[in-house]
Amino acid sequence: MSAETGSRAPHIPVLLEEVVAALDPKPGDLIVDATFGAGGYTRRLLDAGATVHAFDRDPDAIAAGKLWGETCGKEPRLVLHPRRFSEIAEGLAEAGIAGVQGVVFDIGVSSMQLDQAARGFAFSSDGPLDMRMSQEGPSAADFLNEADEGEIADVLYRYGEERQSRRIARAIVAARPLTTTAQFAAVVRKALGYRPDIKGPKAPKDPATRSFQAVRIHVNGELDELVQGLAAAEKVLVPGGRIAVVSFHSLEDRIVKQFLREGAGAVPAGSRHLPQLESKVQAVFEKPSGAIRPTPEEEARNPRARSATLRCAVRTAAPARAHQGRAAA
C-alpha cells in the first residue's frame, strides 16, 4: 500500500523480503495478513507453508482473493475475512482460532485502489470523489460538501499536516459542490498557487497529495482503525509470535513506534522536577527492531516504496494490555 496519490505502477509488495524475514514463517504456522489488498505478502507466506487468514474491508479485494484462491491450488490454506483489521480477534474466533504465529500490516491505500479511477483515491485520473475503502458510509464528496470550513481545515491540518489548511478550506467551501477528484485537486492547487509547468528535480511536490491523504484518512477513520488493529494483533499473537507493520507516512509510523515501544515496557518520560516512579509495566513485546527502510534498489524498482517504513517486534507471554482504541488527537 502507499501514501502516493498521483503515480501509477503495477502492484509490487513493499519491503517483501524484509517482511518475510521478520515473520519467519514455518510450515503449519497461522499468520494474519491484516491488509490483504492484492495478496502480495499472502502469496509468499503461503509459499512458505503457512496458513494465512487474510482480512480486508474492501469487497473488491476479497472478490479478487477468492478468484485467485480457487486457481492457485492453495485455497485450503487461504482463509479470507471480509472485515476491518480492527476485527482480527472476532474473525479468528469465528474460525475457531485462539492464537497465531504472525500478523502483518501494510497500512494505507492499496495500489489497486489507487489505480482504479472510479474509487476516487487518486488525482492522476479523474473520477468520482469517493475514497471509501469499504464502499460504505459517507464519501469524500459528502464530507467536503457538507462539513463547515473549520472542520475541513482541522482535517487537512491534522491528517495531512497541511500548514495552509485554512486557506484551502476557504477555497473548498467557495467552490462547492465538488464531485470529482480533478475538481478537488484543482481547488487545492489554485489555493496554493501551484504551477504544474515547473518540471525537473526542483519541481515542488503536488500539494494536492497532502489534502487527498487527509480526506482519505478522515473518511475511513484510518488512524483509529490502526490503533484498534494493533491492539487486536497484540491480543491474538501467541508467545514468540511476530508482528510486522509497514507504514507510509509519519502519522502512521508515530502510532506504530509508540505502540511497540510502550509494549516493550517503555514509559513516557516524567518531569525532571518530580520524583521518578518505578515502572511496573509488564512488557508484551520484546524490544522492537529499529525502523527498516527500502534499499535504493527497491526504491528505483518500485517508486511507491520510497516513503515506506517497517517496524517489527516479537510477542512475550505477558497478558495483552487494555487499550482505549483511539488515536491521539
Curated annotation (Swiss-Prot):
Binding-site residues, S-adenosyl-L-methionine: G39, G40, Y41, D56, F85, D106, Q113
InterPro entries: RsmH (IPR002903), SAM-dep_MeTrfase_MraW_recog (IPR023397), SAM-dependent_MTases_sf (IPR029063)
Free-text function comment from the UniProt entry: Specifically methylates the N4 position of cytidine in position 1402 (C1402) of 16S rRNA.
Top-level taxon: Bacteria
Region feature (Disordered): 289-308
GO cellular component, one term: cytoplasm
Main location: cytoplasm
Natural source organism: Novosphingobium aromaticivorans (strain ATCC 700278 / DSM 12444 / CCUG 56034 / CIP 105152 / NBRC 16084 / F199)
EC number: 2.1.1.199
Catalytic activity line of the entry: cytidine(1402) in 16S rRNA + S-adenosyl-L-methionine = N(4)-methylcytidine(1402) in 16S rRNA + S-adenosyl-L-homocysteine + H(+)
Position of the signal peptide: none
Location within or outside the cell: Cytoplasm
Alphabetically ordered keywords of this record: Cytoplasm, Methyltransferase, rRNA processing, S-adenosyl-L-methionine, Transferase
Similarity annotation: Belongs to the methyltransferase superfamily. RsmH family.
Enzymatic class: transferase
Name the record gives this protein: Ribosomal RNA small subunit methyltransferase H
PANTHER family attached to this UniProt entry: 12S RRNA N4-METHYLCYTIDINE METHYLTRANSFERASE, S-ADENOSYL-METHYLTRANSFERASE MRAW
Stored SUPFAM superfamilies: Putative methyltransferase TM0872, insert domain (SSF81799), S-adenosyl-L-methionine-dependent methyltransferases (SSF53335)
Annotated GO MF terms: rRNA (cytosine-N4-)-methyltransferase activity
Gene name of this polypeptide: rsmH
One of the GO biological process terms: rRNA base methylation
